[in-house]
């Protein structure tokens, strides 16, 4: 998962380098400098915010990578300001966090990428309490049909065609293994 995060981050950096190169080639060095300053500040702030709130390195790396991947596709991915996760979280293993959040976020990215909506956003919330853990991924995608929601976590169920439909079944397996609960709320055309 860290490799995926680095791949997405590298891809985003290359896009930004192309903008800088283009500005220099058209004789706009001042605009290139301003773009560099703005881009690095924005990226630094986003990474810093995630690292401050999410102390578990694998989860923080996943969120940084998914944020970059979403941005490449014109999707805004934000971490709720109230989110927090300690480095020594006892609720799930780092791999379990990455499996659950990675699959939920990736499904949201794929749904939004296929959507014609203008406002494409994903909000991730991680709330770790003394007696509970809440992981929530919300998106402004097309929504999930009621008939599909009932079998969403069954292996092989997918709106994306044959050979798909394993991610959410794995999420269900992890949630069940940790004796948790999973719930889907969706409204057609809303997300």
Task: Write out the residue ranges for each language-model feature.
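Conserved ATP-binding N-box helix of the HATPase_c
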Residues: 21-24, 94-117
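Conserved short strand/loop->alpha-helix "switch" segment adjacent to the catalytic nucleotide/phosphoryl-transfer site
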Residues: 51, 77-100
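Acidic ATP/Mg2+-coordinating residue in the GHKL
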Residues: 139
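Short conserved segment of the HATPase_c
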Residues: 144-155
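Short alpha-helical Gxxx[C/S/T] motif in the catalytic ATP-binding
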Residues: 167, 171
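Detector for a conserved hydrophobic position within an alpha-helical segment of the HATPase_c
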Residues: 175-176
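A short beta-strand-to-loop motif within the catalytic HATPase_c
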Residues: 184-188
């Amino acid at each position: 998962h860290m490799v995926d995060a680095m791949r997405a981050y590298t891809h985003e950096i290359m896009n930004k380098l192309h903008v800088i190169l283009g500005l220099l080639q058209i004789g706009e060095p001042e605009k290139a400098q301003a773009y560099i300053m703005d881009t690095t500040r924005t990226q630094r702030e986003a990474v810093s915010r995630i690292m401050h709130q999410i102390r578990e390195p694998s989860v923080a790396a996943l969120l940084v990578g998914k944020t970059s991947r979403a941005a490449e596709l014109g999707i805004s991915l934000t971490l709720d300001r109230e989110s927090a996760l300690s480095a020594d979280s006892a609720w799930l293993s780092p791999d379990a966090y990455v499996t659950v959040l990675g699959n939920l976020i990736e499904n949201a990215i794929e749904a939004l990428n296929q959507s014609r909506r203008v406002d494409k956003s994903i909000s991730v919330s991680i709330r770790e309490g003394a007696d509970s853990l809440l992981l929530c991924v919300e998106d402004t995608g097309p929504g999930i049909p009621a008939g599909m929601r009932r079998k969403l976590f069954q292996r092989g169920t997918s709106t994306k065609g044959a050979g798909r439909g394993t991610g959410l079944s794995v999420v269900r397996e992890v949630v069940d293994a940790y004796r948790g609960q999973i719930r889907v709320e969706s409204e057609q055309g809303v997300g």
